[in-house]
């Protein structure tokens, strides 16, 4: 089976690539019958492992300011849709700070026909859908009214059969473009548009075992984590995301409060 892996590492985020690649090669669908092809979008002129490796494909991507690099994610990937159709059976996207810790086999994550051949990650740590951090701005194409939806998805891990995944990319790209034209930014950027696309769809839902923040203590047996950016970059992470540490906007304040809440939920 031909597995496509989408990955963005612009600017200083290139620091994550080598560890991600090594851990992915070792732990993710490492059966010899699977061929993993990496599609890496970066502004670096070289990346670890690419020399003499036909399965690493580097594409130039400028380091866009935050949150453009997140919002433009679907457009960036959609640009190589023809390559993905030709070269892959399934496609997965992983956040730049993803790191595999244990083996993940196909039977664990494979989405079937009843699941629309799509999958996404959900931390499942909310007290009912009224508390889901959906975009409640009616002007946004990502808008979801209160009372709707059964699951909130995290955008750090998504995937599926190539055809269905490209459909996801196309619709989310179109939603984002409409919002850009109307000068609207979805509350949690690409994640808000992902949740709108997946609203009321039956897909394969992956638990926190397949992607939790490094800071969380549970689950202890997580097979993949999202590395702590603050541990790598320190206070510079705030500059990289275009904000000052001591002067947070209301939306950022509530985002931090929300993360603190779910952190204690998993202790």
Predicted regions and their residues:
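A conserved donor-nucleotide-binding helix/loop in the catalytic core
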Residues: 61-94, 102, 106, 189-198
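Catalytic core and acceptor-binding pocket of nucleotide-sugar-dependent glycosyltransferases
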Residues: 141-230
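Conserved donor-nucleotide/metal-binding helix-loop-beta segment in metal-dependent transferases, i.e.
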Residues: 100-138
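Short, hydrophobic beta-strand segments that form beta-sheet elements in well-ordered domains
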Residues: 36-43, 92, 117-118, 203-205
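Short, solvent-exposed loop/turn segments at secondary-structure junctions
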Residues: 10-12, 45-47, 63-64, 98-100, ...
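Short catalytic/ligand-binding loop motif for oxyanion handling, primarily in non-cytosolic enzymes
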Residues: 15, 47-50, 100-103, 108-109, ...
């Amino acid at each position: 089976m031909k597995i496509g892996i989408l990955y963005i590492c612009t600017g200083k985020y290139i620091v994550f690539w080598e560890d991600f690649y090594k851990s992915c090669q070792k732990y993710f669908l490492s059966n010899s019958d699977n061929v993993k092809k990496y599609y890496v979008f970066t502004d670096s002129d070289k990346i670890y492992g690419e020399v003499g490796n036909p399965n690493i494909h580097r594409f130039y991507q400028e380091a866009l300011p935050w949150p453009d690099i997140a919002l433009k994610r679907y457009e960036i990937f959609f640009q190589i849709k023809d390559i993905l159709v030709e070269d892959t059976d399934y496609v997965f996207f992983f956040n730049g700070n993803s790191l595999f810790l244990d083996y993940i086999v196909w039977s664990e994550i494979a989405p079937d026909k009843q699941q629309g051949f799509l999958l996404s990650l959900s931390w499942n740590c909310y007290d009912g859908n009224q508390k889901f951090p959906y975009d409640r701005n009616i002007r946004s194409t990502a808008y979801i009214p209160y009372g709707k939806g059964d699951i909130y998805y995290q955008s750090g891990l998504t995937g599926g059969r190539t055809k269905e995944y490209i459909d996801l990319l196309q619709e989310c790209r179109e939603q984002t473009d409409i919002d850009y034209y109307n000068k609207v930014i979805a509350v949690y950027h690409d994640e808000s548009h992902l949740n709108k696309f997946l609203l009321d769809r039956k897909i394969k839902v992956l638990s926190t075992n397949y992607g939790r923040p490094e800071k969380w203590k549970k689950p202890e047996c997580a097979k993949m984590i999202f590395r702590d950016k603050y541990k790598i970059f320190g206070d510079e992470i705030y500059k990289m995301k275009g904000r000052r540490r001591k002067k947070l906007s209301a939306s950022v304040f509530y985002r931090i409060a929300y993360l603190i809440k779910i952190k204690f939920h998993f202790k």
